[in-house]
Amino acid sequence: MSSQNSFMASKKEDKGKNIQVVVRCRPFNQLERKASSHSVLECDSQRKEVYVRTGEVNDKLGKKTYTFDMVFGPAAKQIEVYRSVVCPILDEVIMGYNCTIFAYGQTGTGKTFTMEGERSSDEEFTWEQDPLAGIIPRTLHQIFEKLSENGTEFSVKVSLLEIYNEELFDLLSPSPDVGERLQMFDDPRNKRGVIIKGLEEISVHNKDEVYHILERGAARRKTASTLMNAYSSRSHSVFSVTIHMKETTVDGEELVKIGKLNLVDLAGSENIGRSGAVDKRAREAGNINQSLLTLGRVITALVERTPHIPYRESKLTRILQDSLGGRTKTSIIATVSPASINLEETVSTLDYANRAKSIMNKPEVNQKLTKKALIKEYTEEIERLKRELAAAREKNGVYLSSENYEQLQGKVLSQEEMITEYTEKITAMEEELKSISELFADNKKELEECTTILQCKEKELEETQNHLQESKEQLAQESFVVSAFETTEKKLHGTANKLLSTVRETTRDVSGLHEKLDRKKAVDQHNFQVHENFAEQMDRRFSVIQRTVDDYSVKQQGMLDFYTNSIDDLLGASSSRLSATASAVAKSFASVQETVTKQVSHSVEEILKQETLSSQAKGDLQQLMAAHRTGLEEALRSDLLPVVTAVLDLNSHLSHCLQNFLIVADKIDSHKEDMNSFFTEHSRSLHKLRLDSSSALSSIQSEYESLKEDIATAQSMHSEGVNNLISSLQNQLNLLGMETQQQFSGFLSKGGKLQKSVGSLQQDLDLVSSEAIECISSHHKKLAEQSQDVAVEIRQLAGSNMSTLEESSKQCEKLTSSINTISQESQQWCESAGQKIDSVLEEQVCYLHSSKKHLQNLHKGVEDSCGSSVVEITDRVNAQRQAEEKALTSLVEQVRDDQEMVGEQRLELQEQVQSGLNKVHSYLKEELRNDVPTGTTPQRRDYAYPSLLVKTKPRDVLLEQFRQQQQEYLESISSVISEAVEPPVEQDSLEDEPPVAVNDSVISERSCIDLSMTCQEKGGIRFFQQKKALRKEKENRGNTTLLERSKIMDEVDQALTKSKLPLRMQN
């Protein structure tokens, strides 16, 4: 019953379980605060993650994240750690499991504090209520509490082991000498367990005894002060608690359940340089680091599943062997420091703990002992101890040294193991002998039954052999016929293989042709796409050019209209101003002549009045007046007539200038008409070019569509040819090759035509574009020359007008000087006449004075009228000259601006035409793709294949050949029989020899019944060997006939049935 319970419990735990890893971070201590160290560790208890900042303080990217089963931050209390980690494990210990909890980490990170804790200064706290108490006191308190509440009978034993400098010491030893070293042996009952010889296990009955034991062990444990920890543990300690619990089954059987809990407080790893350890302390630190390094290598080997795990390299790892990868439930508490000065050790501890998570243990419940077995074990132990005690008291026993005693104990253990092994082998062999004896008896009974059956079957066999002989003859005949058919089938198979190879070759050639068609199709599709894109681009470009030319035509028309209007306005203004100037001059001349005539007549009248005064004076006066009149007329004729003539000449010259301006306007109109005709013709040529390119591209597209339809037709015809190829082989192959070749030649010719049409389109586009460029350039040059000529003529006319105006000014000045001269001469004549009249007639002095005044007034009026006329004429001529200069200057500037604009338009048209040409060249040279020969298209060839099929001879002819072969080989039958049949041998020799093997050349084709019977009689020939022999016989069928081989097989069977094989051979 106990074995059943243990089996069921262990079956539930067959599946491995990972080691539980817990991380606890302590707060900052005084040393770290003095060093101004910052925190590099963040603990997230909810997400069970630890974040380590490996970079600078502000570096957010330099973080490493670790995930564990539980995470406790600096603020975590002792009771929280105990309830989360130890309470579930304690329940499993009470269930009968072996469990281990050990603390791992750097020195000074709180391992001993976590495992043992401290006593508060306030004595009112008990161990279980003390907030600073560790795992060990709380565990023991809860063990007694739980077992007492359940009313279970139990016993608790504790032991405290110290590992110092790779030596074992018992901290609970009753002897005052703590330096006694303990020895460790492998446990023969548990392959992964160890036995510590001389380790004291103390039975405790209540929690108070446990506390005294803890205090005694803590006092004996080796500690020392270093620079990093004032109370640094210099050794590893293993506190073991073994619980024996009594339970009663349903049947009333009393069982003892055993649970064991190992609480391990490891010494911390330390940096000797930082801890200040020297001499003895340095050796201690080296041994501690060595054992912890071995523990790390064991963890790494378990994680990586290496074949060798170095448990024996350290006493610590050897003790923890069952806890790491064994049948124990294990939990690791990794203690770390949050300070930046301990970053390297913290990262190392977290890496070890992270690797330890992957270790798989297979926990098993300890086997429960019955009360009788436990009492027996205790009784034997008591008797052994009594004997040892009596021998020690009486001193009549054997006393040995410890080394000899250990050697003797080792030999005894090894001999016990060998005895156990041999005992197990003897038991197994006895069981095997028993089974063999039973099998022998069964076989003997079966043999007797088989003998009886055999006698009955022999009679049936004799009857069956007669039928079998007849069947064999028929089978031999059928086999011969079948062999003939097989030969024919092989020949037909060879012929079919040749035909299939021919079909494979043709299929490869057809695949090459398909690839050629696909390449052609891909090239044509690419060219068609490029062709459509090119047509759209050319359409857009020519539309842009046409719109640009139309805009430029409109601009040129407006420019020429502006030139015409400007020149017309200038001519009208000049004509009106010249007419006004001529009328003003004529009016001035008429007013002067009228004034002079009036004054002269008035003077004559006045002089005639005085004629009576003195005839002589009258005569003299008349002479003087006549002389003065004649002189005045001559002066007017000689001085004023040339001026009037010059003004008239100036008027005619201005009208000639107007005619020249009209001629220039006519030239500008003709130039305008030339420009209109040029742009109209250029638009027509561009439109024609567009229509030609569209028609050419449409023809190319239609040719491409037809070519595409031809390719589709060729593909359909090709597939039909391939289908016909399978049925009619070579003839259809030749026909298909010829048709495919013709279609390819047709495709090539069409492709050549398409290429020629594209080439002609390219030439037409080049020709039309070059003509358009030349036409534009010639018209541009012509327009520039004509504009230059117009500008030169306008400048010449402006120069001639300027000279005319200057001449007019000179004539006006000359007229003014002539009038001044006449007035001076008149004044001189009047003075002389006055002197003569004064001398002649004093009485006419008053009259002369009045005449003098009158003449002076006349002179002054003539001067005023002439001066105002001259000023008016001069102002009008200057205004006319300035207006004409301004108009001509603006016209010249406008002509220059228009010339620059025409140059820009010419450059823009040239760029557009050049870009169109570049697009055409790139389309014809780069975008159009040619079918590049790959060299993989199959060539035309002839295919060799068999044309005749083998036919099997008729059945009658085959049977006649079979009978002839039987007659030919009858002589060789007797020799074969004599070699095959051997004399009987002795039974002893048969027992020594291996099983008989039949010669492969003797075995013939037999029925399934014969094969099974032969295998039974021979007793060692495997079925596949006979199949192999039969295969060989089929290959060498031409050497011996089937009938003779069947007879030989019968002889061999008879010889084999007569042999007396032992029973072992038959079985």
Curated annotation (Swiss-Prot):
Tissue/organ expression: In unfertilized eggs, shows highest expression in the germinal vesicle and radial yolk-poor channels. Also present in testis.
The keyword Glycoprotein appears for this protein: no
UniProt domain Kinesin motor: residue ranges: 18-359
Recorded coiled-coil stretches: 365-480
PTM-bearing positions, type Phosphothreonine: 937
Disulfide cross-links: none
Gene Ontology cellular-component annotations: centrosome; cytoplasm; mitotic spindle; nucleus; spindle microtubule; spindle pole
SUPFAM superfamilies with a match to the protein in the record: P-loop containing nucleoside triphosphate hydrolases
Function, in words: Plus end-directed motor protein required for establishing a bipolar spindle. Associates with both interphase and spindle microtubules. May be involved in nuclear divisions taking place during the development of unfertilized eggs. Required in non-mitotic cells for transport of secretory proteins from the Golgi complex to the cell surface.
Family from the record: Belongs to the TRAFAC class myosin-kinesin ATPase superfamily. Kinesin family. BimC subfamily.
Protein name: Kinesin-like protein KIF11-B
Gene behind this protein: kif11-b
